[in-house]
């Protein structure tokens, strides 16, 4: 098993030095779900939520979240993102919305945290916009689905 990279030999937290790493194309895809009451799902699906276009605003929030990742995660490097794509999949039977984010950069470190943060912010925005009618929504199943590029190579979830 690999060692944790965000701690030095004395066990102190530090930001990893990526200065000598090659600049490569990096891609990460993350996903997560929010489950809600059938009535809440209908409001989201039909675009009838009191606060407006829930998924449109959640899409913009997810993109903004990806751009702010290094402000939120202490040892995360600031990145020049080259692409952030946000997709929502409505699951009528499960009364849920799946958010999938693909983040890309050309850089010296990966974009996994940006993709994961974007998913969480997108789902939290859905929660925020619908909480007046459903405080019991559940956010879950947030995970990295794949990462491409970099020294450690490609990885795809089982």
Swiss-Prot record:
Pathway: Cofactor biosynthesis; molybdopterin biosynthesis. It comes from the Bacteria. GO terms for biological process: Mo-molybdopterin cofactor biosynthetic process. It is an enzyme of class 4 (lyase). GO terms for molecular function: cyclic pyranopterin monophosphate synthase activity. The active site is at 128. Keywords: Lyase, Molybdenum cofactor biosynthesis. Substrate binds at residues 75-77, 113-114. Signal peptide: none annotated. Its EC number is 4.6.1.17. It catalyses: (8S)-3',8-cyclo-7,8-dihydroguanosine 5'-triphosphate = cyclic pyranopterin phosphate + diphosphate. Belongs to the MoaC family. Homohexamer; trimer of dimers. NCBIfam families: moaC, PRK09364.1. Catalyzes the conversion of (8S)-3',8-cyclo-7,8-dihydroguanosine 5'-triphosphate to cyclic pyranopterin monophosphate (cPMP). This is Cyclic pyranopterin monophosphate synthase. It comes from Ralstonia pickettii (strain 12J).
